Amino acid sequence: MKKNKKIFLLISAIIIISLSLIFKYKTNNEKVKTPKADEISSITFIRVINDRGVEKREVYKKSHINKFLNIIKDSERTKKISTSNFPDKEEFIIVAFKIKDGGFIINSIYEENNSIYFEQAFNDIFKLNYNDNLYLLLDNISQENNKEDISVNIEDLLDSDF
């Protein structure tokens, strides 16, 4: 009888630990993954129309970086999966997080059916809980005078340091 009780307790413990790990993985997988604000030196936003970068904005202020990260973190994972570097849209915005230790993390934002989506390349797509349009979102994060008109092919953008 004692042997059966020990086996039952062991199996119960294994099941509880397994379920806990599955639940932890599931809940962490539902959230958008972004670098921490302290790891980011700047965020570059590049408006792309028909595979050409046409407008560039850069955000350096910690308060603006935090504001953008909070908007992104307050999003809902969709059932859609990203299958490329950029969305298959005529118009979207490249979001390049410049990391203090070097390198970039590149994502994109686009508008579809009056909703704004944050796409992590070859990963997940998240719907932002943001009521205004995409350009008002950018205006709220960076100053209007921070815009720079550019004309660059999207392939050349990937080879640059933004």
Residue ranges and their predicted role:
Residues K2-S12, S18-F162:
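Function-determining sites in protein domains
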